[in-house]
Amino acid sequence: MTCLFALSLGYLWSVANPLLFAMIYYFIFKLVMRVQIPNYTVFLITGLFPWQWFASSATNSLFSFIANAQIIKKTVFPRSVIPLSNVMMEGLHFLCTIPVIVVFLFVYGMTPSLSWVWGIPLIAIGQVIFTFGVSIIFSTLNLFFRDLERFVSLGIMLMFYCTPILYASDMIPEKFSWIITYNPLASMILSWRDLFMNGTLNYEYISILYFTGIILTVVGLSIFNKLKYRFAEIL
């Protein structure tokens, strides 16, 4: 009974946390600033929910090795699974929000597409690779540069507003279009939004997500493999 209650609370938190932010942003941008985007609630949550997965994983990764210091010191195991498990857990929270997206689709007279069956796993795997690459870099470097968390928090907030989550990508002036072009997080969000709202797979965005994700993972694992032998003494 206790386990069931804990699972229920976990599910409620997975849904309530991003939904609360969605309500706040809806009030500010739709009701106050009157942003003219059709089906804005669906538009908002299809960008905000996957963003929450990335942002929570990246932020939590900063302390993933520090929080597991005793296990790292006393047990021999692939330590890279620690940030990976965090990414997977946040991904599970994201999957819990998909029923909420379905409900809002029906509210706005839209329906899920059959392409979700293969589209969700395809984009989700790309996001796992991308987010793991970022997480392994942050979790490793934060052991040696403890002030990194301040810069990461600032960077994530900056990237949130540079990514078309609250606004449509076509609202950006031509001279600032590079913000989307060179922002892999924009490709990630737009991939999800195209799938959920239009039932389409934008393979250009998905390819960018995979390409940058693989590069980040290779770089991250290289940094990790160079520094992992010093973990015990640092911790």
Residue ranges of predicted features:
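Hydrophobic transmembrane alpha-helices and immediately adjacent juxtamembrane helices
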Residues: 1-235
